[in-house]
Amino acid sequence: MALAAYRHLLRATRVAFNEDITLLTSARKQARSTFLANRSLALESPESIAAIAHAEDVAQFLRRNVVQGQKVEGDEKYKLNIHEHTERGDNDTIKMPNGKNVTIDGKTCKD
């Protein structure tokens, strides 16, 4: 389980930081040091299970929610590295915690 979570995390860093070697290297070093720090945990211990779940959550977050951008030379625009794993949504998907739709000036996004 831990090895699979580690591999998922490394793959997610490659997807999220593919163009940025410095950040890719830093993220992988952080993942490695965290896994090495937890190496002595028993496989079925609650701490180990929580650490593996955290690694899987981080991998999922990196894969779906991190998008890097590069400034276009000679322009005030950025080119975003949106990939097939990037979570996409529209304004209709924004919900309040209690399940109500967001309304602005009495209107929803559908109005």
Swiss-Prot record:
Q: Could you tell me one molecular function GO term of this UniProt entry?
A: protein folding chaperone
For the biological process aspect of GO, one term held by this record is: mitochondrial respiratory chain complex III assembly
Predominant location: mitochondrion
Extract the ranges annotated as region (Disordered).
88-111
Keywords in alphabetical order? Chaperone, Mitochondrion, Transit peptide
Entry's localization field: Mitochondrion matrix
A GO CC term attached to the entry: mitochondrial matrix
| Chain's role | Assembly factor required for Rieske Fe-S protein RIP1 incorporation into the cytochrome b-c1 (CIII) complex. Functions as a chaperone, binding to this subunit within the mitochondrial matrix and stabilizing it prior to its translocation and insertion into the late CIII dimeric intermediate within the mitochondrial inner membrane. Modulates the mitochondrial matrix zinc pool.
Q: How does it assemble?
A: Interacts with RIP1.
> In which family does this protein belong, per the annotation?
Belongs to the complex I LYR family. MZM1 subfamily.
User: Under what name is this protein listed?
Assistant: Mitochondrial zinc maintenance protein 1, mitochondrial
What is this organism's lineage? Eukaryota, Fungi, Dikarya, Ascomycota, Pezizomycotina
